[in-house]
Amino acid sequence: YGAAAFARSVSADILTDLLDVYPAKDACTVMAIATLRIIRPSITAERMGTHYRRTFVCQHYPGAALSANTICTFLQKLGQDGNRRKAFYQKRAAAVIASHHIAIDGTLKQDSSTVNDLSAFSYKARRKGCQEVSVLYAYDIEVMEPICAEVFPGNSIDASSYAAFIRDNDIRRGIIVSDKGFPPSQSK
């Protein structure tokens, strides 16, 4: 009970923002999946439904269908609905207190999927022999809370990906955390 109750208590504002953008069933499904992944970080999609029914997560977020196939379909639909995702991100960004700092950072994640058109060989990945995607995200430094995230092709230049990320998510202030893939001329 404790872990699920704690997760619910610190994420109530996220549920409120989700309910403003998504249908109630979808918002509860997002929160159920997120809560289960927090409580059990290594949980697989096949076990998620079982743990959902065995924990208080089903009491907090009722009506979530969490079979492995349903989760996959739901997450694909969620990821493809760019307008709602953008509306949710804008609500989260608007909630950031003016005195707080926003960090914009990115990382490369291995992804050798044959069906993902974002998977590509980055500069470093060519030596390793695996494809990657570039995940960019913005978060509030003071409260250590994510604001938004977006996936880019693994072979894209950091400067162009960051510019598109900032433009797409209408980020007006922030600190860019960059590395050697970001030319000094682009860091204005």
Give residue spans per PLM region:
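Active-site-adjacent structural elements in folded domains
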Residues: 17-18, 120-122, 159-160
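Dynamic "connector" segments at or just before major functional cores
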Residues: 1-113, 136-155, 163
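Long, contiguous hydrophobic alpha-helical segments, chiefly transmembrane helices and signal peptides
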Residues: 71, 134-137, 177, 182
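Flexible, glycine/threonine-enriched loop-and-boundary segments that flank and lead into catalytic domains
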Residues: 111-124
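A general structural signal for short secondary-structure junctions and capping/turn motifs
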Residues: 92-96, 127, 168, 188
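Short, flexible loop/turn motifs enriched in small residues
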Residues: 127-133, 141-142
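Surface-exposed loop/turn and secondary-structure junction residues enriched for glycine/proline
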Residues: 69, 124-126, 155, 185
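Single, function-defining residue in the core of a domain
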Residues: 141-188
